[in-house]
Each structure stands twice: as structure tokens, then as C-alpha cells.
Swiss-Prot record:
InterPro entries: AdenyloSucc_lyase_C (IPR019468), Fumarase/histidase_N (IPR024083), Fumarate_lyase_CS (IPR020557), Fumarate_lyase_fam (IPR000362), Fumarate_lyase_N (IPR022761), L-Aspartase-like (IPR008948), Pur_lyase (IPR004769). Homotetramer. Residues from neighboring subunits contribute catalytic and substrate-binding residues to each active site. Gene3D superfamilies: Fumarase/aspartase (C-terminal domain) (1.10.40.30), Fumarase/aspartase (Central domain) (1.20.200.10), Fumarase/aspartase (N-terminal domain) (1.10.275.10). It catalyses: N(6)-(1,2-dicarboxyethyl)-AMP = fumarate + AMP; (2S)-2-[5-amino-1-(5-phospho-beta-D-ribosyl)imidazole-4-carboxamido]succinate = 5-amino-1-(5-phospho-beta-D-ribosyl)imidazole-4-carboxamide + fumarate. It holds the Pfam family Lyase_1. The active site is at 162 (proton donor/acceptor), 287 (proton donor/acceptor). This is Adenylosuccinate lyase. It comes from Methanocaldococcus jannaschii (strain ATCC 43067 / DSM 2661 / JAL-1 / JCM 10045 / NBRC 100440). GO terms for biological process: 'de novo' AMP biosynthetic process; 'de novo' IMP biosynthetic process. N(6)-(1,2-dicarboxyethyl)-AMP binds at residues 21-22, 87-89, 114-115, 236, 288, 293-295, 332-336.
């Protein structure tokens, strides 16, 4: 049975996981065939309108084309039927539109244009819709992270570098750091839209030869009608550096979500246990064989799909060097790339919003881990204090380093080793050392930094 017969019979044939497992209805609706056809028809309508305004085609023809250039009249099934014969989707769309137009209006469809004027401009409309959805979800995630930063502004935890305990920080700092990064993605998208959301009505090789002297006016007017930026120059296609930038921006977003996911997963390790994603113990099952498991599956899915999104950058970058004025190698690739990158990015953003909102900070384990190294995370503070009190900084570093190594090897508390060191005790009393070893009083300006991030980001307008 041929694919078209299967589709016509109503038999489901979902193959790709974005058809049944990943993606939101909102983003899927953008990239479904019906909407793509709608956007192509919208471009044809804008072209006819612009040409009629400039006296290139009859006004009555443009009005009829604009009336009928919709999936209300032009059916996807009919376009597919024609495409079986033409082996060309844009020609099939043009003929299907011409069939429903009254009089001779159909003769003026696609006047002076080439297929990719329609396809590329329609894709820009689809990308614009996708960006709007992604921007909205980025704002949601940023605001949730800011709320978490405020909530945990004073939740002191161990900072880790190289996977090892470093010095104290706060969970407020971590959440604020992520919020600031998400906000930068909003900035990037805002700045890049003028390069990404563009239109092109320039003809077979970009010279506008078929459009005549009014070609530039038509080109600019179509962009105005559609709410896009007209490209400055093109050949037969909008240049793919623009599309590669778009895919790369979504991959950057995915990698930020990956970073958040990696941290959550690491902090949910049994022996760390500081963070935990939402888990419903009344129904949810973590393993088919280990009844006790509570796995960070939401953030694992985010991390896994971020790899797929990242891989799409390579495919789209390979679409930049097309032959001369263009070849068709980008077309088949982009039928996969654009839908996948948008649907998957939207999907993991949706997961991140829910996952971060319900994320639990286990403060008991956070407190336990602060003492896990028996005071070693306070070594920097002791060194700095000794330097402030007159011991040379380099000397202080070496003395505290030796004390820290001894504490580590003997599995003793750093404070006890320091109390035994005569050089250290010349500068610090026992009572002072007791206070200096408190990790909760060594978080620097973390609360103020978090406040500054919250204030700055919440006052931003996009």
C-alpha cells in the first residue's frame, strides 16, 4: 500500500517520535502540512496584492486570489493529487489555487516569482510563529528561575569545581545564573529576528528580471504586507547563513537546558541528594525491576534531546554552500531540520518549565554536605584572613594548604589541625577560628548579586 493510500484510508503511521511522543500541540500545529500550505498561499496572496497595487496585474484578479488563497478553499488533499503528476509541490499548490479562482484570476498567480520566493518566505512565517512560542516559554522559565532564586537566596550550599567541593555558595546564585543565561537567549532572538524573519520575491536567480522595473517595489511591499524584513540581496534562495543562525540559537537554548539538567541530575545522585525532581510515589514507577527507584527522567529527557537539537546545526550549516545560485540539496534536509529543531526545542522548554517549577531542594542534605569535607571548604577564608592580619598571602596559602592536606589524609576536621598550628594561632584566636569556620557566613555578596539579577531581569522589556 502506498503512503498516500495509507493516509487517505486514515490508518495511522507514526514513525518519528515527534509525531507521538515529543512536542506540544501548539508547536506541532505550526509545522503541520496544513499550516505550511496556508503560509505558502498567504505569500502568493501578498504577492498578488502588491503587484495589483503597482499596476502589474489586474486589481480584480488580485482580489480573487486573496479571497481564495486559503486552505478553506485550497485543500491539502487536492495539492497532493496534483503533485503526484507534477512532482513539484509549489506548482501543485499554484494549480490547486488556480482551480478555485473564478474567471481568469488564476492566470496571474505567481507572476514573476520562483518557487523559493514562496517556500522560503513561507518558512520565514513559520519560523516567526515558532520564535514567538519559544520566546514566551523562555520568559516563563526565566521568571520561574527568578522566583526560585529569591526563595533560595540564603540557602547556603557547597560550591563545586572540577566535581570537588570548593567554597560555599547559595542555590539562589545557581538559579539566578540560569535565569540570566535564559534572558540572554531572549536578547539573542530579539536581535537576530531581523536577519532570520525575512522575505524574498526576487525571481529565478535574484535579479528580479521577470518582475521588470517595479521588482524592488514588489519585493519590499510583499515584506511589508507579511510583517517581514525584505532581504537586501539573494539568488534563488534566502541565504542559509540566516537559517543556520536560527538553528544554532535554538541549539544554544537547548544546551542551557542541558546544563540545568546536568546539574539537577548530578545533585539528585543518592549520595548527594540536594535536588529532586517531582515524583508521584502513589503511581509513578522508576524501574521495571527495582521498585525503589526515583529517577530524574524529566531532566534526562531534556539532556538527551538537547543532543539531537545540537546535531541539527551541522545539517543546516551544510546547507550554506549551495551550488552557484542554488541547488536542491537544502530542501529535503530542511523539511526535517526546521520542524524537528522547533518541535524539540519547544518540548524541552516545556519540560524545563514544569521540572524547575516543581524542583525540590532537600535542605537537610544540603546542610549535611556542607560539613562533608570536615571544614576544608573554609580553607580559602582562613588563608585570606591570615593575609589580612599580616601573614604574607603566599605564606598563608602554603601553611593552610599543608594543614588542609594533613586534615584530608588523617580524616580530621580542618579546625582541629589549624588549632594545632602555632603560626596560624599567632594571628587568630580559638573563638575567632570557630566563627571563621562557619560556611553560612562565607557567601560573599551572593544575596546582593541575586537581588541585582532579579531587579535587572524583571525590569527588562521585550
Amino acid at each position: 500500500m502506498e503512503l498516500n493510500q495509507i493516509i487517505k484510508s486514515g490508518e495511522k503511521m507514526a514513525v518519528h517520535p515527534i509525531d507521538y511522543r515529543y512536542g506540544t500541540p501548539e508547536m506541532r500545529k505550526v509545522w503541520e502540512e496544513e499550516n505550511k500550505l496556508e503560509k505558502m498561499l498567504k505569500v502568493e496572496a501578498a504577492l498578488a496584492k502588491a503587484q495589483a497595487e503597482l499596476g502589474l496585474i489586474p486589481k480584480e484578479a488580485a482580489e480573487e486570489i486573496n479571497k481564495k488563497a486559503s486552505t478553506k478553499y485550497v485543500k491539502l488533499e487536492r495539492v497532493k493529487e496534483i503533485e503526484k503528476q507534477t512532482k513539484h509541490d509549489v506548482v501543485a499548490m499554484i494549480r490547486a489555487l488556480a482551480e478555485v479562482c473564478e474567471g481568469n484570476a488564476g492566470e496571474y498567480i505567481h507572476f514573476g516569482a520562483t518557487s523559493n520566493d514562496i517556500v522560503d518566505t513561507a518558512n520565514s512565517l513559520l519560523i516567526k510563529e515558532s520564535i514567538e512560542i519559544i520566546e514566551d516559554k523562555l520568559k516563563q522559565l526565566r521568571d520561574i528561575l527568578l522566583d526560585k532564586a529569591e526563595e533560595h537566596k540564603y540557602t547556603v550550599c557547597v560550591g563545586r569545581t572540577h566535581g570537588q567541593h570548593a567554597i560555599p555558595t547559595t542555590y539562589g546564585m545557581r538559579f539566578a545564573l540560569w535565569a540570566a543565561e535564559i534572558d540572554r537567549h531572549l536578547e539573542r532572538l530579539k536581535e537576530a529576528k531581523k536577519r532570520i524573519c525575512v522575505s524574498m520575491i526576487t525571481g529565478a536567480v535574484g535579479t528580479m528580471a521577470a518582475m521588470g522595473e517595479k521588482g524592488l517595489e514588489v519585493h519590499k511591499r510583499v515584506a511589508e504586507i507579511l510583517g517581514l524584513e525584505p532581504v537586501l540581496i539573494s539568488n534563488q534562495v534566502i541565504q542559509r547563513d540566516r537559517h543556520a543562525e536560527f538553528v544554532f540559537l535554538l541549539a544554544l537554548i537547548a544546551q542551557t537546558l542541558n546544563k540545568i539538567g546536568v546539574t539537577v541530575r548530578s545533585m539528585q545522585r543518592t549520595e548527594i541528594g540536594e535536588l529532586e525532581e517531582e515524583f508521584d510515589p502513589t503511581k509513578q514507577t522508576g524501574s521495571s525491576t527495582m521498585p525503589h527507584k526515583r529517577n530524574p527522567i524529566t531532566f534526562e529527557q531534556i539532556c538527551g534531546l538537547s543532543r539531537v537539537i545540537k546535531s541539527l546545526c551541522i545539517a543546516e550549516m551544510d546547507n550554506i554552500p549551495l551550488w552557484e545560485e542554488r541547488d536542491l540539496t537544502n530542501s529535503s534536509a530542511e523539511r526535517c531540520i526546521f520542524a524537528e529543531v522547533c518541535v524539540l526545542t519547544d518540548h524541552i522548554l516545556t519540560l524545563a518549565i514544569k521540572g524547575v517549577k516543581k524542583l525540590k531542594v532537600n535542605k537537610e542534605n544540603v546542610e549535611r554536605n556542607l560539613e562533608l569535607t570536615k571544614g576544608l571548604i573554609m580553607a580559602e577564608r582562613i588563608m585570606i584572613e591570615l593575609a589580612k592580619r599580616g601573614m604574607g598571602r603566599q605564606t598563608a596559602h602554603e601553611i593552610v594548604r599543608q594543614c588542609a592536606m594533613k586534615a584530608y589524609e588523617e580524616k580530621r576536621h580542618l579546625k582541629d589541625i589549624l588549632l594545632e598550628n602555632e603560626e596560624v594561632m599567632k594571628y587568630i584566636t580559638k573563638e575567632e577560628l570557630e566563627e571563621l569556620m562557619n560556611p553560612k557566613t562565607y557567601i560573599g555578596l551572593a544575596p546582593q548579586i541575586v537581588d541585582e539579577v532579579i531587579k535587572t531581569l524583571k525590569n527588562k522589556k521585550y
